C-alpha cells in the first residue's frame, strides 16, 4: 500500500494527541508524517517527548513567522512531496493554510472551526471549488455513539419531520474558565466562543436535522470573566495563574490549589501550564481570566431558522458548576430527549447512564415513553475520536446508512451561525444567511 504523505501545520496539543500520536501508533501502515510546521520551534521537541515514535524518523521541521509562512509552507510542500495537510494551528490562521493547500491541489484536514468568520469560510469554499483537493472538517462529536444514534432515529423517521430543537450547553468552571486563560479569549484569534466552541453544537444540530441555516438572532453577555467578573480579586491586568500572588483569593483557581501545591485535574483542553516541563517558548496559556483585553462573551442565547422549517433555540454558559447538555428534538410524530453531565464539578450529579450505557428517551406523540440504551464508545469525545480517525486515514466506512464525515459546506454552515451569533449580539438584528448559504 502506498502511504499518503502528511504535513501538520500547528504542533498544538490537539495536533499531538488527536493526529500525530495515532498516525504513528495506529495508522503507520497507510499514513506517513513527513513534516511539522509551527511558529514555535519548542513545539517540535514537545511532540518528540510526548510521542517517542516521532524521534529518529527524519520528520522535517519548519519554523514560520507571520510574515514568511507562505514561503515556508510552499517550500515544505515541495521538499517533502506532501499529499495532504492537517491544519491544527490557532483558529485565525486556519484559512491561510487551508486555502493555500487547496490552491496547491492538496487534500486538507482542518480541525474545527474551519475558519473564524463567514468571509474566510466563503474563501475556503471558493478555493475548494477550484481545486482537485478536498477538505475534511473534523467535527468529531458527530461520531459520539449517542449522537450517531440520534441521527439514525431521525433518518428512520421515528419522530417524523423535525420541527424544533432545544439545546442547552453547560461548560463548567474548570473547562469554561480555561478558554479565558488562553488565546481563545480574543475575538480576532478564535472568532469568539460562538464559533470556537459552539460550532461543534451548531454542526451537530444541522447534521441531525438536515438543516441549512437561514436566519439567526442572539443575545449575549460577559457575565463571569473580564475585569467586572464577580470573583475578580482585584482589578489589574497582566497576572498569570501559575505565579499569581492572588491565586488563593481567586474562586476559580483556589479549588485546584493549596499554599504549597497545585492539584492536577485531568482535562484534555488545558494543563500545559500545570506541568514542570516548559511547553511553549513565549506564549503562556495561564493568562488571567479577569484581564480587561477579553472581548468575547461567556453567556449567549440563540434562535436559528432553517430552510426546512425547523427551529433551534440554543444557549451556552461557560461558568457552570458542572459540564454537559440537555437536548430535546421535536417532530411531527414524537420527541427525542437526552442529557449528559460530567466535568470537574460533576461527580455529585445523578448518573446519565444505566448499566454503563447512556440513553435516549423516545416519546411517540400519542404513546408512552421508550428508553433506548446506547453502549458507550472507547476513546475521546465519548468514543468519537477513534472512529473519525478511521474515516480520515482509511476512507469513509461504505456500510453506513448516512454520511457522517463533515465537509467544507458543513464548516461553512456551522461557522456562519456562530459568526452571526456574535454579530447579532453586537447589533441586535436578525442575521440573514440566505444570500450565500449552501
Language-model-detected regions and their locations in the chain:
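N-terminal glycine-/serine-/threonine-rich beta1-alpha1-beta2 phosphate-ribose binding loop
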Residues: 1-104, 122, 126-132, 393
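Predominantly a Rossmann-like dinucleotide-binding segment in NAD(P)-dependent oxidoreductases
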Residues: 12-17, 141-287, 428
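Catalytic cores of eukaryotic secretory-pathway lumenal/extracellular enzymes that build
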Residues: 13, 31, 91, 95, ...
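C-terminal helical cap and adjacent loop that interface with cofactors, partners, or active-site loops
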Residues: 18, 296-438
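Rossmann-fold dehydrogenase core element
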Residues: 123-140, 161-164
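Short Gly/Pro-enriched turn/cap motifs at secondary-structure boundaries
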Residues: 186, 194-195, 290-294, 317-318, ...
Amino acid at each position: 500500500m502506498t502511504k499518503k504523505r502528511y504535513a501538520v501545520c500547528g504542533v498544538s496539543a490537539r495536533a499531538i494527541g488527536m493526529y500525530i500520536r495515532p498516525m504513528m501508533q495506529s495508522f503507520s501502515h497507510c499514513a506517513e508524517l513527513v513534516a511539522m510546521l509551527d511558529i514555535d520551534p519548542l513545539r517540535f521537541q514537545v511532540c518528540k517527548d510526548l510521542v517517542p515514535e516521532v524521534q529518529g524518523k527524519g520528520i522535517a521541521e519548519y519554523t514560520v513567522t507571520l510574515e514568511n509562512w507562505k514561503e515556508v509552507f510552499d517550500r515544505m510542500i515541495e521538499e517533502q512531496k506532501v499529499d495532504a495537510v492537517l491544519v491544527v494551528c490557532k483558529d485565525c490562521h486556519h484559512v491561510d493554510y487551508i486555502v493555500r493547500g487547496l490552491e496547491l491541489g492538496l487534500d486538507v484536514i482542518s480541525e474545527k472551526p474551519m475558519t473564524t468568520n463567514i468571509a474566510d469560510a466563503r474563501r475556503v469554499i471558493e478555493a475548494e471549488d477550484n481545486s482537485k483537493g478536498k477538505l475534511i472538517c473534523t467535527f468529531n462529536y458527530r461520531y459520539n455513539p449517542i449522537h450517531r444514534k440520534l441521527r439514525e432515529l431521525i433518518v428512520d423517521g421515528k419522530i417524523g419531520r423535525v420541527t424544533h430543537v432545544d439545546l442547552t450547553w453547560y461548560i463548567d468552571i474548570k473547562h469554561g474558565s480555561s478558554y479565558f486563560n488562553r488565546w481563545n479569549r480574543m475575538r480576532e484569534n478564535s472568532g469568539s466562543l460562538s464559533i470556537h466552541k459552539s460550532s461543534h453544537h451548531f454542526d451537530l444540530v444541522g447534521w441531525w436535522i438536515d438543516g441549512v441555516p437561514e436566519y439567526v438572532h442572539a443575545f449575549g453577555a460577559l457575565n463571569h470573566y473580564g475585569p467586572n467578573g464577580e470573583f475578580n480579586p482585584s482589578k489589574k491586568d497582566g497576572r498569570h495563574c501559575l505565579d499569581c500572588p492572588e491565586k488563593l483569593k481567586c474562586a476559580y483557581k483556589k479549588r485546584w490549589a493549596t499554599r504549597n501545591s497545585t492539584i492536577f485535574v485531568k482535562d484534555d483542553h488545558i494543563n500545559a501550564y500545570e506541568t514542570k516541563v516548559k511547553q511553549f517558548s513565549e506564549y503562556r496559556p495561564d493568562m488571567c481570566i479577569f484581564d480587561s483585553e477579553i472581548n468575547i462573551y461567556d453567556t449567549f442565547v440563540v434562535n436559528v431558522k432553517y430552510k426546512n422549517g425547523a427551529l433551534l433555540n440554543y444557549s451556552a454558559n461557560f461558568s457552570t458548576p458542572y459540564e454537559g447538555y440537555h437536548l430535546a428534538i421535536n417532530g411531527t410524530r414524537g420527541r427525542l430527549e437526552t442529557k449528559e453531565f460530567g466535568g470537574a464539578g460533576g461527580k455529585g450529579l445523578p448518573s446519565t447512564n444505566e448499566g454503563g450505557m447512556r440513553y435516549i428517551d423516545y416519546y411517540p406523540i400519542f404513546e408512552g415513553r421508550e428508553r433506548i440504551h446506547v453502549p458507550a464508545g472507547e476513546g475521546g469525545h465519548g468514543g468519537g475520536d477513534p472512529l473519525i480517525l478511521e474515516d480520515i486515514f482509511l476512507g469513509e466506512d461504505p456500510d453506513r446508512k448516512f454520511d457522517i464525515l463533515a465537509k467544507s459546506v458543513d464548516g461553512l454552515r456551522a461557522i456562519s451561525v456562530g459568526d452571526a451569533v456574535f454579530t447579532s449580539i453586537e447589533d441586535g438584528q436578525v442575521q440573514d444567511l440566505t444570500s450565500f448559504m449552501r
